[in-house]
């Protein structure tokens, strides 16, 4: 690969002085609300994306104004656990210093601030730091926020899995002091080293999870590296290691495709960090730094072969993978309402549509959560399905917390199973990559699907339905039973045939069709499912069995097959 010209991102990282660039100078430049040159990309490795409000972009251009530049920040919260004190801190910042006033829970099991203007950026990082939160490496060519199954019931096993998620996150973090120097006025302490990530970091983004079967809420096949918890007598003994999943693709480029992760085998829990490091450094050294569209771990595995990659990981750790231990996934959705943990503590899972926490007319969700945070003695847990768990509630506080939640629209008994199993990425107006609506499209379209479900006698059932505004895959549509991927305004590619467990990639059924056309297709398909399904057969399994689409078995070979 060395004879070929490296992608420009490789130059940018190499010249960045360990991610510093000239960000500090840019912060002082008040001629533009944005970041210039390389800094536009470099801020991603500090957890931010430069965006603008696309709803008013044309209007501002007419007024000879630049786009309304702002940043989106994604916090680093391994396992998604946040204390009530931290919650009140981010609630206040979102209200006082963001354009939209909201907290957005994301599929990366963390929160995002949208619409932070340049004069507030440094203060934002300092505010987060005051509450023990940072945004290091939540974007860019690094290991991103580490996910962990939200399972408050099995409290002991979950706690240990969560501790490993935190340890993995810390171990794989960039070691540069650039973040502390720029945002927290940290001391400049001499030369930096990056023993794991290297001076040019990874070829592309890298996503890691810790998952506790039978619950696949974090969608293992969407991630580069997964540690599947294996327990004996309720105690964690180790992990099966799954490598090379990922959902992003590029419209029109058949060299890009979603891919499921491969099971490399079982490891003892004490070897977890060694294996995490070995997988990351193998991808660091073997990944494609010429073509970013083929730079992720999934493409490295396709190019060099699973066996060669696995052997290199074993060589770097000095430990052989053991044979995989058996496990099964049975579900992905969150368990809404109250559940009791084995420790007797109560846990309340709240459905937050699209993860958008804001005071809506008649549903002051943001105020309600702040009121709960003021009295709650446990913690909050963000889920990878964009919902929120009020965890560790003592029995005596249960009624009080439920009363606040109901008064603020945080509990709604009328929400259907279909709505609970529908999800979208942010898309317009803030995401610069969005080709179509997703978050703003989902609620009303889900209402239309609910009507179709009721018409066919399926009102109590559900289909895993997901929408992404572009093919990058943040909403994980490529693991849905019905997935829509944006192509243009009100036009989507329409995929069917994933399964409820999240272990099969769907296939394209129709290309570039409108939402009205999609609804007609869904009506016909759900009608057949209602009449012809086997007992308890999910929609995705039905469309495969009925021959409506062929299953995607090996996506590198058959994802684009007719």
Curated annotation (Swiss-Prot):
Positions of siroheme binding: 474
One Pfam match: NIR_SIR
Cofactor note: Binds 1 siroheme per subunit. Binds 1 [4Fe-4S] cluster per subunit.
Swiss-Prot/TrEMBL keywords: 4Fe-4S, Amino-acid biosynthesis, Cysteine biosynthesis, Heme, Iron, Iron-sulfur, Metal-binding, NADP, Oxidoreductase
UniProt cofactor(s): siroheme; [4Fe-4S] cluster
Cellular component GO terms, alphabetical: sulfite reductase complex (NADPH)
Swiss-Prot/TrEMBL GO biological process terms: cysteine biosynthetic process; hydrogen sulfide biosynthetic process; sulfate assimilation
EC top class named in words: oxidoreductase
EC number of this enzyme: 1.8.1.2
Single GO molecular function: metal ion binding
Catalytic activity: hydrogen sulfide + 3 NADP(+) + 3 H2O = sulfite + 3 NADPH + 4 H(+)
Described function: Component of the sulfite reductase complex that catalyzes the 6-electron reduction of sulfite to sulfide. This is one of several activities required for the biosynthesis of L-cysteine from sulfate.
Subunit structure: Alpha(8)-beta(8). The alpha component is a flavoprotein, the beta component is a hemoprotein.
HAMAP family in the cross-refs: CysI (MF_01540)
Protein name as it appears in the record: Sulfite reductase [NADPH] hemoprotein beta-component
